[in-house]
A protein has these predicted regions:
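ABC ATPase "signature
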Residues: 207-208
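Conserved ABC transporter NBD signature motif
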Residues: 55-70
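Conserved ABC ATPase "signature" region
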Residues: 92, 96, 102-119
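A short, surface-exposed alpha-helical micro-motif characterized by mixed small hydrophobic
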Residues: 189-191
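Conserved ABC ATPase signature
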Residues: 123-127
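Catalytic Walker B motif of ABC-type/P-loop ATPase nucleotide-binding domains
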Residues: 148-151
């Protein structure tokens, strides 16, 4: 298959409430997809179904291969690392969780790739907010994933930190890694995403490249588009 991920007409119900109502989306190699929508719109539930954390009541999820778990990376907002360990020690430990033994050279190369070479021996607790975000992403790369899920990767960062994370994410996509990320920052979405999927009340209300969506809906910006399509939904 040409896609790394195909979610097809997903449905998830909780009693009489339908949290996900026919959501479909795809991620191709090297593609950066933004999943956006109001709080409670069904984004998190959609991702939980895709990742196998919840069983769908309808639809299906198809990956590029059977049992792809060891080639999927997940970065959550909550810092996943051990604060008392150095950046290098965290990376070595998390690689072991995936059954991977990294050499010193491999650890150094991965830290360099994520802009962390100068703080390899610094405890995670002493890293800046931007460095901690980059370390969180580095940990997801320890097992060489082909598909990444990033939860608000630029949230709570200053402009330099957001810039550095965007460069890192683009560099990963350039190697063929497929990336799906969530964000409430429409400016960041416009700068980073190849494609935007907007979920409102459990349904996909828009799906396409940012420039195409603006033209299709006659919006001046992604923020205007978001506000128009989510009116009375938040």
């Amino acid at each position: 298959m040409s896609h790394l991920l195909e979610a097809q007409h997903l449905i998830k119900r909780y009693g009489s409430r339908t949290a996900v109502d026919g959501v479909s989306l795809e991620v191709s190699p090297g593609e950066i997809v933004a999943l956006i929508g109001p709080n409670g719109a069904g984004k998190s539930t959609t991702l939980e179904v895709i990742l196998g954390l919840r069983a769908p009541d309808g639809g299906k999820v198809v990956f590029w291969r059977k049992d792809p778990q060891r080639e999927i990376g997940i970065q959550l907002q909550a810092t996943p690392f051990f604060r008392g360990l150095t950046a290098a020690e965290n990376l070595r430990l998390f690689a072991r969780f995936y059954g991977v033994r990294l050499t010193q050279a491999q650890i150094a190369a991965l830290l360099e790739r994520c802009g962390l070479a100068s703080v390899a021996r610094t405890e995670a607790a002493k890293l800046s907010g931007g460095q901690q975000k980059r370390l969180a992403i580095a940990l997801t790369l320890a097992h060489h994933p082909r598909l990444l899920f990033l939860d608000e990767p630029t949230a709570a960062l200053d402009p330099r930190g957001r810039h550095d994370i965007r460069i890192l994410i683009r560099s990963l996509a350039a190697t063929g890694v497929g990336i799906i990320f969530t964000s409430h920052d429409m400016e960041e979405v416009g700068k980073l995403a190849d494609r935007v999927v907007l979920i409102v009340a459990g349904r996909v209300h828009a799906d396409g490249a940012p420039v195409d969506l603006l033209a299709r809906f006659g919006a001046a910006s992604l923020e205007d588009l978001y506000l128009d399509l989510t009116a009375d939904k938040e």
